[in-house]
Amino acid sequence: MNRVLYPGTFDPITKGHGDLVERASRLFDHVIIAVAASPKKNPLFPLEQRVELAREVTKHLPNVEVIGFSSLLAHFAKEQGANVFLRGLRAVSDFEYEFQLANMNRQLAPDVESLFLTPSERYSFISSTLVREIAALGGDISKFVHPVVADALTERFKK
């Protein structure tokens, strides 16, 4: 059984993330969206809410599971029985960092392969950072995130 682990902060999960998960769900037996606590990134949403939003966005995919984690990714992958790390590459500029990460993960978890997918063209420019900035300034984010995520962002920035 191929179990792929798609790690990230998902602050928030975007349509670009959803696109990768949809495609991975057709390629793998089981997809785990691994939502990292990432306290050093000072996320906008708490871990529990990011997990819940990702579950809501992917609930139509029966072979997708969403789990929050705060441990070392290599350890978490072993705990979950994952044999592949999935990473998205939006642009060439993402490659250098992702390549370093893949090599480090290979040292820490040699039995887990890294697989890179590029997003569909219509989502290639979307980033969680840009979505947060647009939402904070009152812009329309409906093209970039699922409605439940848009609602959560709108509510968050009302405060």
UniProtKB/Swiss-Prot annotation:
GO terms for biological process: coenzyme A biosynthetic process. It comes from the Bacteria. The record marks 17 as: Transition state stabilizer. Its main location: cytoplasm. ATP binds at residues 9-10, 17, 88-90, 98, 123-129. It is found in: Cytoplasm. Its EC number is 2.7.7.3. GO terms for cellular component: cytoplasm. Pathway: Cofactor biosynthesis; coenzyme A biosynthesis; CoA from (R)-pantothenate: step 4/5. Substrate binds at residues 9, 41, 73, 87. Its cofactor is Mg(2+). InterPro entries: Cyt_trans-like, PPAT, Rossmann-like_a/b/a_fold. Signal peptide: none annotated. Keywords: ATP-binding, Coenzyme A biosynthesis, Cytoplasm, Magnesium, Nucleotide-binding, Nucleotidyltransferase, Transferase. The keyword Protein biosynthesis does not apply. SUPFAM superfamilies: Nucleotidylyl transferase. One of its GO terms (molecular function) is pantetheine-phosphate adenylyltransferase activity. It catalyses: (R)-4'-phosphopantetheine + ATP + H(+) = 3'-dephospho-CoA + diphosphate. It is an enzyme of class 2 (transferase). Belongs to the bacterial CoaD family. Homohexamer. Reversibly transfers an adenylyl group from ATP to 4'-phosphopantetheine, yielding dephospho-CoA (dPCoA) and pyrophosphate. This is Phosphopantetheine adenylyltransferase. It comes from Pseudomonas putida (strain ATCC 700007 / DSM 6899 / JCM 31910 / BCRC 17059 / LMG 24140 / F1).
